[in-house]
Amino acid sequence: MTQHESANSQPSAFSLTFGDNGVAWLKIDVPNERMNTLQSAFVDQVTDVLAQLKDKKDIKGMVVYSGKPDNFIAGADIRMLAACQTADEAQQLAAKGQELFGQLEALPFHVVAAIHGPCLGGGLELALACHSRVCSDDDKTRLGLPEVQLGLLPGSGGTQRLPRLIGVANALDMILTGKQLRAKKAKNLGLVEEAVPLSILLDIAEKQALKGKPKRKGSFQEWAMGGNALGRSVVFDQAAKKTHEKTRGNYPAADAILDVIKYGLQHGMKKGLDQEAKRFGELVMTSESAALRSIFFATTAMKKESGSDALPATIKKVGVLGGGLMGGGISHVTATKAGYPVRIKDISNDGIKNALVYNFKLLDKQRKRRIISKAELQNKMFSITGGTTFTGFTNVDVVIEAVFEDINLKHQMVKDIEQQTSDYTIFASNTSSLPIHQIAAAAERPENVVGLHYFSPVEKMPLVEVIPHQGTENGSATSEQTIATVVALAKKQGKTPIVVADKAGFYVNRILAPYMNEAAAVLLSGEPIEHIDRSLLDFGFPVGPITLLDEVGVDIGAKISPILLAELGERFKAPDVFDLLLSDDRKGRKSGKGFYLYNTKKKEVDKSVYKLLSLEPEQKAAGQDIALRCTLMMLNEAARCLDEGVIKSARDGDIGAIFGIGFPPFLGGPFRYMDTLGAKRVVEMLKDHTDKYGGRFTPCDKLVAMANEEQSFYS
C-alpha cells in the first residue's frame, strides 16, 4: 500500500493519503491530545479535506481510521457545551456535527470506518455515517453512545442512524442505557460487519472499501419497527415502561431519546435529525445535564490526582487478611483489575475456600458471557492463592485487612504483619467504623498504616475512602508515600478514591447514618416500609433506606451507631429498633430475615416486623415530605464534614456521596444540590424540621454562615 501525503499547511485533525489502488485514507489524529475527541472547529477541517476528494476521479473507496495507538474517537469534547448560553447555541453545535457526518455519508464511494479502541458518542456517530464498519477484536475496543449518562442524547445523527442499522429495540437498549459493546457483541448486532485481529484491521478495511457500497439489508424487525405502527408502538411502550421504572421521571434525556427516535421513524431522516438537534439543545440547558456533566469533569480530574505529593511505591504482590465477602471482593479487584498476584490469609480453610469460590463465580459469569476465555479464567484464578498461615506473605508490598470489626483483633493483625513482612509493607485496614489511629497504635511502623474503606459488593461499588491517620502517641502519621501508594492501587482496582480524615464514620458512613436513622424514625412514626422506600426511590436514590438496612445488615448498623454517638453526639442517636430486630435474629438478607421477606418470588415486606415493633402501619406523610426529611439530615452532615475538614472539597463530598451511597446523580451530589436550593433555603427547611422533629435538624454553623453571606459551595 503506497500512500502520498496531501499538502496541508494548517495543523489539522484530519489528513488524507491516497493509495495506488484507488483507496483514500482519512486519518483522524487530534494534535497534542492523547485521545481523539471531536470539536466544532472540525467541520471546516473536514470540509477542506473532502474538497480534496472532489479533484480525484479515480477513488474507489475510503478508510477512516485513527492515528492514535489505542483509541478511535472517545466522543465529542463536552467542554464545548459549557460555553453555550442558550438552547439555540447548543442546537447549532449538534447541527454542525450532523452536517459534518452528512458530508461523509454523501460521498459517492464506499466509506469504511476501521475502529480500534474506544469508539464512543460522537465517535460512533461518525462511524455510523460511514457505509461500513470493521473493528478490532481487542479488549480495548468499545462501541457505545453514552450521552444519556451526561443527561443528553446523541446529537449528531446517532438517534436516527442506529435504529435503522440494528433495529429499534437494540438501538433503544444501547442509547437509553449508554452501554458500551465489545467487538463480538457489536458484530452480532450488526453494528460492525467484521471483528478482526488488530494486525489485519486496516487490510480488511481496505478490502471492504474496494467493494461497492453495501445495500441496506431489510429485515422483518426493521419493517415492523419502521413501517408498522402497531409493532413500533409495542416496542416503544415497553421501553418507556422499563425506562420509567429505572429513572422514575428524574432524567429528562431518557424521555427525549424515546421521543426523538419515534419521531424520526414516523417523519423520516431529515425531520428526525432536526428534532434530534432541537432536543439536544434543550437538554444541554437542563439542571440534570449540568449536574451529570459536573460529575464527569470531577471524576476526570480525580484520575490525575495522587492524594499526595509523594511518588507511589512499586507494588508487585498484595496480601488480603480475611476470606469473607469483603476479602473475596478485594482480592478479586486486586487480581483481575489491578493485575497483582494476591495471597489470602484466613483462620480457616473454609474461609479460603469461600474467597476462591467467590472469585471463581465472578469470573465464570464473565466466561459464560464470553468476556473472557476459559484459559483467561484459569490464569486469573492461578493469581489468587490462600492459606491459614502467613506462608507467601514475606514479599507482599501491601496487606489489606478485612477481618471482624474488633480493635484487639486488628491490633493482632498489625503485629503479625509487621513480624511477617518487610519494613516497607503497607498495612491498609478496611474498617468501616474504627479510627485508624487506634489501629495504628499497635504498630511499630505507624507511618505504614492507613485506612482503605471499600463498599460492598466490592466488585461493583466504585468508591474507596483512603484514610491517613495523624499519628499515634508513640509514632508518626501515615506517610505521604503510603497515601500515594494506596491511591494508585485503588485506581488500578478500578476505584475512585477520595482521601478523607480519620474521624468517626469517615465521610460516607457519617452522612449515611443520620439519613438511615431518620428513615427508621419515620418507620417508628407508623409509615409503611414500602412507602418509605418508594419515597426515596422516587427522589432518586437507587435503593430505599429500609431495603439498604436489610442489605448492609442490621448488625452492622447496630455496631457503627454507638461509635458515632460517642464521638459525634446526640444527633447520631439511633431509634430503638436495632436491639429489637437483633433479638428476633433479623439481620437482614444475610440471615434471611429482616424488614423484607426473602426466598420469595416477589419483593414483599415481612409484615410480622410491625408486630415486633408494636406498630400499626398507616400512610400519612407525602412521599416528597419523607424524602426531604431523610435527605436534609444527610445534607446538614455533609456540610459539617466539609467544615471540619473530613473531606477536602465539595467536589470530593459530591463524588463520595454519589459513588458511595448512590446520592441521585442528576442532582450532582449533596453540595451541588444545596447550591441549587440555595443555602438560605436549606437553612429555612432545617429550621422548619427542627420545630417539627427536634434538635437533630439544627442547621450547622457552616450553612448558617453561608446563608447569611449568600455564599455557595461552588463558585
From Swiss-Prot:
Residues 8-197 are annotated as: Enoyl-CoA hydratase. It catalyses: a (3S)-3-hydroxyacyl-CoA = a (2E)-enoyl-CoA + H2O; a 4-saturated-(3S)-3-hydroxyacyl-CoA = a (3E)-enoyl-CoA + H2O; a (3S)-3-hydroxyacyl-CoA + NAD(+) = a 3-oxoacyl-CoA + NADH + H(+); (3S)-3-hydroxybutanoyl-CoA = (3R)-3-hydroxybutanoyl-CoA. One of its GO terms (cellular component) is cytoplasm. Its main location: cytoplasm. One of its GO terms (biological process) is fatty acid beta-oxidation. GO terms for molecular function: 3-hydroxybutyryl-CoA epimerase activity; enoyl-CoA hydratase activity; long-chain-3-hydroxyacyl-CoA dehydrogenase activity; NAD+ binding. It is found in: Cytoplasm. Catalyzes the formation of a hydroxyacyl-CoA by addition of water on enoyl-CoA. Also exhibits 3-hydroxyacyl-CoA epimerase and 3-hydroxyacyl-CoA dehydrogenase activities. In the N-terminal section; belongs to the enoyl-CoA hydratase/isomerase family. In the central section; belongs to the 3-hydroxyacyl-CoA dehydrogenase family. This is Fatty acid oxidation complex subunit alpha.
